[in-house]
From Swiss-Prot:
CDD domains: gram_neg_porins. Pfam families: Porin_4 (PF13609). One of its GO terms (cellular component) is pore complex. It is a multi-pass membrane protein. Its main location: membrane. The gene is ompP2. It is found in: Cell outer membrane. Residues 1-20 form the signal peptide. This is Outer membrane protein P2. Keywords: Cell outer membrane, Ion transport, Membrane, Porin, Signal, Transmembrane, Transmembrane beta strand, Transport. The lineage of its organism: Bacteria, Pseudomonadati, Pseudomonadota, Gammaproteobacteria, Pasteurellales. Belongs to the Gram-negative porin family. PANTHER family: OUTER MEMBRANE PORIN F-RELATED (PTHR34501:SF2), PROTEIN YDDL-RELATED (PTHR34501). It comes from Haemophilus influenzae. GO terms for molecular function: porin activity.
Length: 367
């Protein structure tokens, strides 16, 4: 019997939780280990400044490992610690397979109650991370973090007490600071002060959001204001000071057809230091369709525009399609491709066009 798309999506979340192995469970304490190894073989082509480039690769695709410890106090109260790593290329050396180093992606603690919500502190996802509905495995054409940061060093509150509704708010703190002063400070280090935030990195920010996903309806919206550190020694014109951004999604599931259609969008206004402000927006219709049991077809299109008053204008059109298939409850294979074209217009220069095409075949093994 054919499953509905809603059941598949719920099943996907359940499967991701089931992939974790419970290594300890006693007296209200539960410890889980899990993760995945993911490999992709890809071919990419790009045209930048009329120069064509082409390369193929076999590389790691966001392989990860996580550990989660949950302690239940009773009466619905709990505390949780979570650590998730990523495999990435070494900072030094020439390896490009992304298997060089292990880094910390998320690390946070949570205090919560099933009825009243939870407070999360540490390096974690924000409410903006789950707002849009577009599906992708590797070549996602949406750049949500350009509009609102989707993760960082944060204090966050999330409420899930109403079925299908998630409410959240996050306060972002600086995550990248000079470790040393003087010339040892690195970029801009001549006048660096130990402990100061790196120029053009997040200084602080706030965001709020809500998402509803029930009764075949998906609706979500998030707003964020993010402040960026200016160099206290070099007053460069055009450096961003603040970004006010919004993200939204609206979708509907045709359960009998196994089809989800959605429309994602975003808007941002960037305030630059003693320079003209920049405005950005995008719209992105998309779909997810169940071809057969354990096989899904998905895609989305994006139109994005960045503009400066009486200045440079940039337009990007991008499209993505993919098919994934579950060989086993813990084995997923997929093929995905994306194409993007960017046109840049400046009053004093000729129009510039850049193109990029990518296609990849991937395999994920969960544990």
């Amino acid at each position: 019997m054919k499953k509905t798309l809603a059941a598949l999506i719920v099943g996907a979340f359940a499967a991701s939780a089931a992939n974790a192995a419970v290594v300890y469970n006693n007296e209200g304490t539960n410890v889980e280990l899990g993760g995945r190894l993911s490999i992709i073989a890809e071919q990419s082509n790009s045209t930048i400044k009329d120069q064509k480039q082409q390369h193929g690769a076999l590389r790691n695709q966001s392989s990860r490992f996580h550990i989660k410890a949950t302690h239940n106090f009773g009466d619905g109260f709990y505390a949780q610690g979570y650590l998730e790593t990523r495999l990435v290329s070494a900072q030094s050396g020439t390896e490009s397979d992304n298997f060089g180093h292990i880094i910390t992606k998320y690390a946070y603690v949570t205090l919560g109650n099933k009825a009243f919500g939870e407070v999360k502190l540490g390096r974690a996802k924000t409410i903006a991370d789950g707002i849009t509905s577009a599906e992708d495995k590797e070549y996602g054409v949406l750049n949500n973090s350009k509009y609102i940061p989707t993760n960082g060093n944060t204090v966050g509150y999330t409420f899930k007490g109403i079925d299908g509704l998630v409410l959240g708010a996050n306060y972002l703190l600086a995550q990248e600071r000079y470790k040393y002063g003087g010339a040892a400070g690195g970029a801009g280090g001549a006048g660096a002060v130990a402990g100061e935030v790196y120029p053009q990195k997040i200084s602080n920010g706030v965001q709020v959001g809500a998402k509803y996903d029930a009764n075949n309806i998906i609706a979500g919206i998030a707003y964020g204001r993010t402040n960026y550190r200016e160099s206290i020694h070099e007053k460069d014109l055009g450096k961003k000071q603040q970004v006010n951004g919004a993200l939204s999604t609206l979708g509907y599931r045709f359960s009998d057809l196994g089809l989800l259609v959605s429309l994602d969008s975003g808007y941002a206004k960037t305030k630059n230091y003693k320079d003209k402000h920049e405005k950005s927006y995008f719209v992105s219709p998309g779909f997810q369709y169940e071809l057969m049991e354990d096989t899904n077809f998905y895609g989305n299109f994006k139109y994005e525009r960045n503009s400066v008053d009486q200045g440079k204008k940039e337009r990007e059109q991008a499209v993505l399609f993919g098919i994934d298939h579950k060989l086993h409850k813990q084995v997923l294979t997929y093929i995905e491709g994306a194409y993007a074209r960017t046109r840049t217009n400046d009053k004093s220069k000729a129009e510039k066009t850049e193109k990029e095409k990518s296609v990849g075949v991937g395999l994920r093994v969960y544990f």
